[in-house]
């Protein structure tokens, strides 16, 4: 409808009225104006016609909608009636609810005022009861009952009391309040004085009696402080007595080496017993969350007594002087004033034991305080919980006992490192190899020392101490001890008396120089080359075995330490960060194993080059002296009396017999593998220098098979891959015709992977005297 009306609006008048007025048309006189107006009227007529057509087209749709609206009329009337009825019901319900709720509110207000009146009456009665009761209790010296009345008075609603003072009974209330306030002051003074007297005389029943009364008077902090004062006096008395006994104990007693650790343990166990005994009393009478306050007072006394014990320990064990001597030795190298490792052993054990007891004590305190705070903070907000957590950490980490233990461990770590290094040097100097043993004593001794030092650090329950000692152990094994083995292997495997002497002199000079420069103790007498040749050979083989055992021991040590550290972690002794640090240190330790494996490979390569290569090369070269350009008669003779391979096998058997006895099975296997690679390489070079007939190629194939079979029997390594090129050469030398190679080459090779290049194949074919060079050149490989 709007679209139909729009042209009329554009024409500036109502619908159906032209924009050109009749008067205007009558006034026109010019033909051009008439034509223009006529054209305009024609255009308007066309627009009107379009509008009419549109309206006529919408007629059916409009009539349908109107009919639909007419049908909806009765329903709309029904809906209107229902809506009016619903509105009336809602208005009625609203009025009814308003009336009921107003009465309920009035009833609630009345009930509240009634309760307030009852509460006020009860409080006034309680006030009167407390006033009478506290006076009677004080006269009878029943301080518990008097405190209960005062506690009841303090728990009354102060606003109700103020209202009562303003009411008709105001004077009576004021009088009762005055009496109660005076009784409160007197009772607080009396109970505090009696508690101080009981603490001074050490009367435990009276101390506990008045300690239980103070929280009823609102004196929680004072009660805990006075009770802690009594406990501290008892603690100090017992600790001083134990320290006197420790200082005066006989040095021959069984526990004499750890007497100060035992004394510290008694002190800490005493505090633990106090907590276990009196924590229920504190929780019952003072409520949860108060244990931290009591322990804060006790910890101060613990710090004093622990410091006395540690001071006596430092004095009696000459701890600081030992540390200074050790530090001087480690910084300046060898000095005349030197401590024997065995003199440090008992001191180090006692220090770790003391720290272990302190860590156990701190874990005990943490568990008890955390459990106490959890009950108290059940409904507390996050800020209070964080505050309690911070106060706990401050108590445990900033106390004097914690700092003292850190100082002791700070001295312990370099002393333990010194003990480890000196003991390892002694083990190296005292190294002996028993007859029939593959390795010498130094390996077991060194790893016993390393394990002992790290295990002792573990007993301290300090993750930082454990990390430090694992790192020091890694350094000792990786540098000091490995360097000893390197120097022994650097002397080489003697092959003759003259070479042995020359090698020994040169090695002695280099080792003496490195020892002087690095300050390391090495067993030079075993590498000077002055012992017999057989002893030098045995020493070299023993060193190889030592290197292998070291590599295995490091891996075993790492696994054992992981298990020990897991036990330490399961006791809650370390955080996640500490676990990550220890895991990182253990990873560095096990990485040292690969360096020993590399050293073993170097030593075996040296042994292979020195003892095996000079022997094997001439044996393989003897293959040249055996003609392989043979006929039937010679082939039969070779079959009856093998000219090469059997002799070679016997020679190899004799050569490796010494190593089989002197080396571990794993090392012997590896050495055999190196020898196998050498044989394959030298054999290949030698074959290229020979010429073959058809039967000669067959003889070579038999010799190669016998050699491979023997070498496979003496090693668990797979050696066929090393002889793959030689096997393929034997195959080529066995061909009847040159063209037969094409049955094995290229797409006809099947699963066979050729290790020989086309040029090498032609070179092998050229070794056959009966193959023409023209046929070989014509091959397309």
UniProtKB/Swiss-Prot annotation:
<dbReference type="GO" id="GO:0005829">
    <property type="term" value="C:cytosol"/>
</dbReference>
<dbReference type="InterPro" id="IPR048680">
    <property type="entry name" value="COG4_N"/>
</dbReference>
<dbReference type="GO" id="GO:0001501">
    <property type="term" value="P:skeletal system development"/>
</dbReference>
<keyword id="KW-0333">Golgi apparatus</keyword>
<comment type="similarity">
    <text>Belongs to the COG4 family.</text>
</comment>
<dbReference type="InterPro" id="IPR013167">
    <property type="entry name" value="COG4_M"/>
</dbReference>
<protein>
    <recommendedName>
        <fullName>Conserved oligomeric Golgi complex subunit 4</fullName>
    </recommendedName>
</protein>
<dbReference type="Pfam" id="PF08318">
    <property type="entry name" value="COG4_m"/>
</dbReference>
<dbReference type="Pfam" id="PF20662">
    <property type="entry name" value="COG4_C"/>
</dbReference>
<keyword id="KW-0813">Transport</keyword>
<keyword id="KW-0472">Membrane</keyword>
<dbReference type="GO" id="GO:0006890">
    <property type="term" value="P:retrograde vesicle-mediated transport, Golgi to endoplasmic reticulum"/>
</dbReference>
<feature type="region of interest" description="D domain">
    <location>
        <begin position="614"/>
        <end position="736"/>
    </location>
</feature>
<dbReference type="GO" id="GO:0000139">
    <property type="term" value="C:Golgi membrane"/>
</dbReference>
<dbReference type="Pfam" id="PF20663">
    <property type="entry name" value="COG4_N"/>
</dbReference>
<dbReference type="InterPro" id="IPR048684">
    <property type="entry name" value="COG4_C"/>
</dbReference>
<dbReference type="InterPro" id="IPR048682">
    <property type="entry name" value="COG4"/>
</dbReference>
<dbReference type="GO" id="GO:0015031">
    <property type="term" value="P:protein transport"/>
</dbReference>
<comment type="subunit">
    <text>Monomer. Component of the conserved oligomeric Golgi (COG) complex which is composed of eight different subunits and is required for normal Golgi morphology and localization.</text>
</comment>
<dbReference type="GO" id="GO:0007030">
    <property type="term" value="P:Golgi organization"/>
</dbReference>
<keyword id="KW-0963">Cytoplasm</keyword>
<feature type="region of interest" description="E domain; essential for proper cell surface glycosylation">
    <location>
        <begin position="737"/>
        <end position="781"/>
    </location>
</feature>
<dbReference type="GO" id="GO:0006029">
    <property type="term" value="P:proteoglycan metabolic process"/>
</dbReference>
<dbReference type="GO" id="GO:0017119">
    <property type="term" value="C:Golgi transport complex"/>
</dbReference>
<comment type="function">
    <text>Required for normal Golgi function. Plays a role in the vesicular trafficking between the endoplasmic reticulum and the Golgi apparatus.</text>
</comment>
<keyword id="KW-0653">Protein transport</keyword>
